[in-house]
């Protein structure tokens, strides 16, 4: 006959709740999972299902949720999840910024679309780069790797009353400059060619104003930009995979002491 044990039930809730806090914090900042198109109820269900799976492999936690230690652990889980998600978001933000620069140089900044995630108008080229990057991330099984990296954090930083090393935040800041540099270098040839083209158009307009080169400037920059993108797109996936792997190596060592 089945006997209900209230203490075992409370212990089950504790072991389900604390991992779910870290998972929900990751979902709030990590790429793909932080999409506004995914309903909050779906995210909540996913978080508790993943937490239930993870809890089977983790040490048991017997700390009351509403105690002082429990509140400190909740804050710690939120910090770990948010930090991990923001670290993964760096690649998308940096490449997204590069797309905005190219769009501005091509004269496509006026062609904007409303982005539901950022609640702002963004250029069509930036939307294209963002969607392309998301598809590459899925093709690379980035969503699975993200959950695997999250599970590894439960091994390196178990659910208990500990204090995060402040150097972790410095690691993320130092890593962000390398990611932004790699992302700019990824699209650097297009940026340089467009810059030289705009500079040449400006010089020609000053040397021979009767030609009225500025009337053709927009058409020329747009055409050259499209041609450059045509030759650049085939090498874009392999370059992004290199950046993804660099992110993977960094995340594996982020929470290691």
Curated annotation (Swiss-Prot):
Q: What's the name of the protein?
A: Flagellar biosynthetic protein FliR
Which of UniProt's keywords are assigned here? Bacterial flagellum, Cell membrane, Membrane, Transmembrane, Transmembrane helix
Q: By which gene is this protein encoded? A: fliR
Q: Does this UniProt record's set of keywords contain Mitochondrion?
A: no
Q: Which organism is it from?
A: Buchnera aphidicola subsp. Baizongia pistaciae (strain Bp)
Where do the TM regions start and end? Answer: 12-34, 44-66, 79-101, 121-138, 145-164, 179-201, 214-236
GO cellular component terms? Answer: bacterial-type flagellum basal body; plasma membrane
Record's keyword annotation contains Cell membrane: yes
Q: Which domain of life is it from?
A: Bacteria
Q: What taxonomic ancestry is recorded?
A: Bacteria, Pseudomonadati, Pseudomonadota, Gammaproteobacteria, Enterobacterales
Location of this chain's protein in the cell:
Cell membrane; Bacterial flagellum basal body
Q: Which GO terms describe its biological process?
A: bacterial-type flagellum assembly; protein targeting
Q: What is this protein for, i.e. what is its function?
A: Role in flagellar biosynthesis.
Quote the NCBIfam families the UniProt record gives.
Answer: fliR
User: Which family is this protein grouped under?
Assistant: Belongs to the FliR/MopE/SpaR family.
Instruction: Please give, as recorded in its UniProt entry, the membrane topology of this protein.
Output: Multi-pass membrane protein
